[in-house]
Amino acid sequence: MLSKTSLLSLLSLAAGVVNADFGITTNDDSYVINANSPNSLVFTVDRGSCDITSIVHYGTELQYSGKGSHIGSGLGTATVSATKSGDYIKVTCETDTLTQYMVVHDGDPIIHMATYITEEPSIGELRFIARLNSDVLPNEEPFGDVSNTADGEAIEGSDVFLVDGETRSKFYSSQRFIDDQRHCIAGDEHRVCMILNQYETSSGGPFHRDINSNNGGDYNSLYWYMNSGHVQLESYRMGLHGPYSMYFSRSGTPSTDIDTSFFADLDIEGYVAESGRGTVSGTASGADSSFDWVVHWYNDDAQYWTYTSSSGSFTSPAMKPGTYTMVYYQGEYVVATSEVTVSAGSSTSKDISGSVETGTTIFKIGDWDGQPTGFRNAENQLRMHPSDSRMSDWGPLTYTVGSSSLTDFPMAIFKSVNSPVTIKFTATSDQTGAATLRIGTTLSFAGGRPQATINDYEGSAPSAPTNLDSRGVTRGAYRGYGDVYDVSVPEGTIVEGENTITISVISGSSGDDFLSPNFLDAVFIIALVDN
């Protein structure tokens, strides 16, 4: 329900282009912030809860009337203040363990935000959610209807739905952090985008992904997930998350190049200015140049990353001082790790080199890129459930080395769906010695891991992988710890001529269909030992 203050804001801006002065109107229960932007932006913040209860952009109310926009699931109660200093307005919402900042610059249709925490919120995740009017803003960008679950029938938990014959979920809106600088919801006359300026205190690394948007019918949600337990590989980081910016425009999509260095002058807890940071520059070398190369730095307090140039040169983002683990990826596969120390006000030189060593291979299925790219259904898995009718048949399948296509091998093997997968290959007489079957995976669920049988020889059962306690493949995730399993194949097991390998899923757990124990593939290699 719109408050009296919200209704007055709406009426006063009905013309859409008439702006009052930049400033704050203080009411008994709210602050009304006028950005004085050309396409007017006026929003209302509840003084008791920190909820945004009204957002009027160009004369139209964008905020959902039933529930506010806020950090987490709402702070409940907070100490809320609003101050104006020159060209900036800052709203500060404080609890014992969290401070939420909202900053507006005179003339800009942007709500800049940052979130400072000393403890993880009790709900177990840290997010900002804007609940916006789905009648005015029905669309989601850039992936469209894959996360529009309005009028859907739940088919898995409370977050995967069937809509008009298609499986959809809010998780299918995700994008890798390294590639996600902007995601939006939009309508014919308005667009609202989340611009992500800083991931340093988030968790998961460059290839982590999380929910970005979800039109659930009553309202369209625009998110920024700073951390969560959604296939999470790291501990949560405390401190300042952000800045991140909610940008309001009409037909145009805003640039991601937003300067938020003014935060240094606004007494934002935990903010580290450019002058207090350093960089790392160098050259990466050795990996397969057919893949993107990424360099990643992390410690308990911060994380950063960058793509290298085609020649391997790189410069990091501006980093907080400290000692970092430095990782070099071929695609998403780790080929080297090192350590580097960053000092404020200086650039550190640090090269890194690494490659994938596999020995003399008899065959290889897939690539050492840390992803299931190219395997059957990999092209659809990010945006739909494995049960979707648009998916190709999962099998069980047989892959014949030399004649099958990569799409004849499934991107995931499920204990109750398509286990085992069969591989057939032909060996020459000089390929019958001792060998290693190396199975590269990206993610497991419910303890699922591979057990291989080569002709009549059954490889040993590997120990259970680390349990992430999170659904993965059914929610559009594929990246976990990237476990690699080596199966020692005794001399004479491989015979001259035709050979057969079966790969089965083993686990002490069970489940139905696509929630049965499973693992996702990256590469299968059989290589001769010391040949």
Curated annotation (Swiss-Prot):
GO CC entries: extracellular region
Signal peptide: 1-20
Catalytic reaction(s) noted: Endotype eliminative cleavage of L-alpha-rhamnopyranosyl-(1->4)-alpha-D-galactopyranosyluronic acid bonds of rhamnogalacturonan I domains in ramified hairy regions of pectin leaving L-rhamnopyranose at the reducing end and 4-deoxy-4,5-unsaturated D-galactopyranosyluronic acid at the non-reducing end
Keywords for the protein's UniProt record, in alphabetical order: Carbohydrate metabolism, Cell wall biogenesis/degradation, Disulfide bond, Lyase, Polysaccharide degradation, Secreted, Signal
EC number in record: 4.2.2.23
Role played: Pectinolytic enzymes consist of four classes of enzymes: pectin lyase, polygalacturonase, pectin methylesterase and rhamnogalacturonase. Degrades the rhamnogalacturonan I (RG-I) backbone of pectin.
Record family assignment: Belongs to the polysaccharide lyase 4 family.
Protein's name according to its UniProt entry: Probable rhamnogalacturonate lyase A
Species assigned in the record: Aspergillus niger (strain ATCC MYA-4892 / CBS 513.88 / FGSC A1513)
Gene (name only): rglA
